[in-house]
Amino acid sequence: MNPLIQSLTEGQLRSDIPNFRPGDTVRVHAKVVEGTRERIQIFEGVVISRKGQGISEMYTVRKISGGIGVERTFPIHTPRVDKIEVIRHGKVRRAKLYYLRALQGKAARIKEIRR
């Protein structure tokens, strides 16, 4: 990476991000603007992918809401995310869990590991 770009982005990186991987269940506290008010909206689900590096690193969280799968993609170092909580660690053998989109109910469960 260009040293100039690297020096500019180092100040933007957040240090309060917990370690999480695909398969982990996380609770994301996202700031949402509604009119003139700003509030925290909690989005809890399974991390199905994590891609990119540095300031442009992103992760995708999937949850089932009302029987419908909902996915949201967040940048890791965005100020729009207040905090990320890791609820449980899942045991998976893939980096991208896109196959969970086709599974329903008990088939979509991920085994928990103790860390």
Curated annotation (Swiss-Prot):
GO cellular component terms, semicolon-separated: cytosolic large ribosomal subunit
Gene Ontology biological process terms from the UniProt entry: translation
Alphabetical keyword list: Ribonucleoprotein, Ribosomal protein
Short name of any one Pfam family annotated for the protein: Ribosomal_L19
Entry superkingdom: Bacteria
InterPro entries: Ribosomal_bL19, Ribosomal_bL19_CS, Ribosomal_bL19_sf, Translation_prot_SH3-like_sf
A GO MF label: structural constituent of ribosome
Role, per record: This protein is located at the 30S-50S ribosomal subunit interface and may play a role in the structure and function of the aminoacyl-tRNA binding site.
Family from the record: Belongs to the bacterial ribosomal protein bL19 family.
PANTHER family from the UniProt entry: LARGE RIBOSOMAL SUBUNIT PROTEIN BL19M, RIBOSOMAL PROTEIN L19
Protein name: Large ribosomal subunit protein bL19
Species whose genome carries this gene: Streptococcus pyogenes serotype M1
